């Protein structure tokens, strides 16, 4: 077994004494650092590699801290002006994950880089901490690598803001199978198809 396999097995048992101690120490360290900061290397190299990270030029790791909990509706003094069913302010649940929020914030900070993926590293009662893998589309090592140079294409600018990363797709309800026929090809396209009168010649 290689070293990464051992790391992977360690991470699977998060309640073990070793990992609990490690997470507690790291959590204290992360609380002292800035909300978004660059990491010299991934703290979970096995997970980072599974998500596409390579330890070579052009790949960057950023850490982000996101406050836990729901999203309060931003209305002045709780005045929502509408039907009683839409008057909720406090106990609303955000439809996207905190991980996608972390990706978006890092992507906004590093606008010249492309967000590839992200993963959980720690959490406490107030915050969740994530590491985001970014790729430099201007770097020659990226542009010449056929496995990653798809991300150089301009259509992949700010993937994280458009729900195109792994965690972003999850909140869009996209999947395969009979349960996803309302969202297959995108929910707006499905709505349009269902609401467009189509009169075939032979029907």
UniProtKB/Swiss-Prot annotation:
Residues 160-186 are annotated as: Disordered. It is found in: Cytoplasm. One of its GO terms (molecular function) is RNA binding. The gene is rpl-15. Belongs to the eukaryotic ribosomal protein eL15 family. One of its GO terms (cellular component) is cytosolic large ribosomal subunit. The keyword Signal does not apply. It comes from the Eukaryota. The keyword Hydrolase does not apply. Keywords: Cytoplasm, Ribonucleoprotein, Ribosomal protein. This is Large ribosomal subunit protein eL15. Component of the large ribosomal subunit (LSU). Mature N.crassa ribosomes consist of a small (40S) and a large (60S) subunit. The 40S small subunit contains 1 molecule of ribosomal RNA (18S rRNA) and at least 32 different proteins. The large 60S subunit contains 3 rRNA molecules (26S, 5.8S and 5S rRNA) and at least 42 different proteins. InterPro entries: Rbsml_eL15_core_dom_sf, Ribosomal_eL15, Ribosomal_eL15_CS, Ribosomal_uL23/eL15/eS24_sf. Component of the ribosome, a large ribonucleoprotein complex responsible for the synthesis of proteins in the cell. The small ribosomal subunit (SSU) binds messenger RNAs (mRNAs) and translates the encoded message by selecting cognate aminoacyl-transfer RNA (tRNA) molecules. The large subunit (LSU) contains the ribosomal catalytic site termed the peptidyl transferase center (PTC), which catalyzes the formation of peptide bonds, thereby polymerizing the amino acids delivered by tRNAs into a polypeptide chain. GO terms for biological process: cytoplasmic translation. Residues 169-186 have a biased composition (Basic residues). Its main location: cytoplasm.
């Amino acid at each position: 077994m290689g070293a990464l396999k051992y790391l992977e097995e360690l991470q699977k048992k998060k309640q073990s004494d070793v990992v609990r101690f490690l997470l507690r120490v790291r959590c204290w360290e992360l609380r002292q650092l800035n909300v978004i900061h660059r990491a010299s290397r991934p703290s979970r190299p096995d997970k980072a590699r599974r998500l596409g990270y390579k330890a070579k030029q052009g790949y960057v790791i950023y850490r982000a801290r996101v406050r836990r909990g729901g999203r309060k509706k931003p209305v002045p003094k709780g005045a929502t002006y509408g039907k009683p069913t839409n008057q909720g302010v406090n106990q609303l649940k955000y439809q996207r994950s905190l991980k996608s929020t972390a990706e978006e914030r890092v992507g906004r900070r590093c606008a010249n880089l492309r967000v590839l993926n992200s993963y959980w590293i720690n959490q406490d009662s107030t915050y969740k901490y994530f590491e985001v893998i970014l790729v430099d589309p201007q770097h020659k090592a990226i542009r010449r690598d056929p496995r990653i140079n798809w991300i150089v294409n301009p259509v992949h600018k700010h993937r994280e803001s458009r729900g195109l990363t792994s965690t972003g797709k999850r909140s869009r309800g996209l999947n395969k199978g009979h349960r996803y026929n309302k969202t297959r090809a995108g929910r707006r396209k499905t709505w349009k198809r269902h609401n467009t009168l189509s009169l075939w010649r032979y029907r």
